[in-house]
Amino acid sequence: MLKFIIPTIMLMPLTWLSKNNLIWINSTAHSLLISFSSLLLLNQLNDNSLNYSLMFFSDPLSTPLLILTMWLLPLMLMASQSHLIKEPPVRKKLYITMLITLQALLIMTFTATELILFYIMFEATLIPTLIIITRWGNQTERLNAGLYFLFYTLVGSLPLLVALVYLQNTTGSLNFLLLQHWAQPLSTSWSNIFMWLACMMAFLVKMPLYGLYLWLPKAHVEAPIAGSMVLAAVLLKLGGYGMLRITSMLNPLTEHMAYPFLMLSLWGMIMTSSICLRQTDLKSLIAYSSVSHMALVIAAILIQTPWSYMGATALMIAHGLTSSMLFCLANSNYERIHSRTMILPGGLQVFLPLMASWWLLASLTNLALPPTINLIGELLVVMSVFSWSNPTILLMGTNIVITALYSLYMLIMTQRGKHTHHINNITPSFTREHALMALHIIPLLLLSLNPKIILGPLY
């Protein structure tokens, strides 16, 4: 595992020692090398996990998320270049250092064997993200967003620490690999119920569950582009990853406890999709669509069948790439028009035809068009939820229709219609932006050809 962690950390001296005109070239090129080398992890055998040491391991659940994390760093660097163009070199280097720190922490989060190490890294990812949001965000509202983000996640995850200390005292170890074999079946006593809640709350806030999601649209809207990308693509997946890891230790209590949360997420899925139809703010719409997609993942994980686990992992990876791409597209609009309102850039298709085709591709993957990986994930989740309880097909069907509606609404509002005069002298799109979109969509299309590599450990 060190072959990814050490090069990532060594990107920092590289950035600080680069000449001012080579900062972006060096950091992007070398982070791309790291992300290409991480693809070798897909080569491992499906039936077992790789134990690198006592600290780190990877199995078919964490490997796709690891690769997604490493794949995103060069993309974030590519996306951030134009909005940092007026900053002094020291600030650019600081910004890149924050992103690199975040990637190193995320790699350690996804490969930790020890629950306490996982918890520390899980919490540590807050710090760089918070700095990125509150320092480089666009409006002054960003401080409020940072506060929401910090307090929601901290209050949610403090009980988890208490639960972990309790687990350590009762079982003597917090190793993932051992606990799965040692865990005593939990009875339905009040103390166990509270422990279950303590374990799950941190991840449900991070996902986020309907009702605990208020920090997400705020953080997304105020964050700079790299903040939005990493938040949508990887930080939300931390919640799903943690839930997948920890539910195996909390059986058979989960079967008793899951009902209210299942209902909440199935209902919240429709509510947040409906909120999307009323949005005027482009970034806010994409943020709410993230909430509704993640609600599907929560439902899938709480049902705990092999099918739903496979659907959850596929949906997490697919959503990571898709929402990140949508944020990049929204950002390229924002840099030209300097507004996130969807009505203003109407008719952009005439001016930026290639960008319009990226918009079309991104919207179609977001609404889970066959044969994309999004559809595979959604189908697996819908089938497993349907076999758990038949009436849920009404909720699921409604959600799929609303998702299609708001995706097409977003596409039509930004690309079609009559263009207004204020976008007549718009700057053309850069090759850098097209490369960025291509690097998002190519993995999605390739995964559609071979989805089995991201279906998790139960495939």
Swiss-Prot record:
Residue stretches in coiled coil: none
Catalytic activity reported: a ubiquinone + NADH + 5 H(+)(in) = a ubiquinol + NAD(+) + 4 H(+)(out)
GO CC annotation terms, alphabetical: mitochondrial inner membrane
Pfam families: Oxidored_q5_N (PF01059), Proton_antipo_M (PF00361)
Transmembrane region(s): 22-42, 60-80, 92-112, 113-133, 147-167, 193-213, 224-244, 257-277, 284-303, 308-330, 342-362, 393-413, 435-455
Membrane-protein topology: Multi-pass membrane protein
GO molecular function, one term: NADH dehydrogenase (ubiquinone) activity
InterPro entries named among the record's database cross-references: NADH4_N (IPR000260), NADH_Q_OxRdtase_chainM/4 (IPR010227), NADH_UbQ_OxRdtase (IPR003918), ND/Mrp_TM (IPR001750)
EC number from the UniProt entry: 7.1.1.2
UniProtKB keywords: Electron transport, Membrane, Mitochondrion, Mitochondrion inner membrane, NAD, Respiratory chain, Translocase, Transmembrane, Transmembrane helix, Transport, Ubiquinone
Subcellular localization, as worded in the UniProt entry: Mitochondrion inner membrane
Main subcellular location: mitochondrion
Function: Core subunit of the mitochondrial membrane respiratory chain NADH dehydrogenase (Complex I) which catalyzes electron transfer from NADH through the respiratory chain, using ubiquinone as an electron acceptor. Essential for the catalytic activity and assembly of complex I.
Quaternary structure and interacting proteins, as annotated: Core subunit of respiratory chain NADH dehydrogenase (Complex I) which is composed of 45 different subunits.
Similarity section: Belongs to the complex I subunit 4 family.
Protein name stated in the entry: NADH-ubiquinone oxidoreductase chain 4
Source organism of this protein record: Balaenoptera physalus
Upper lineage: Eukaryota, Metazoa, Chordata, Craniata, Vertebrata
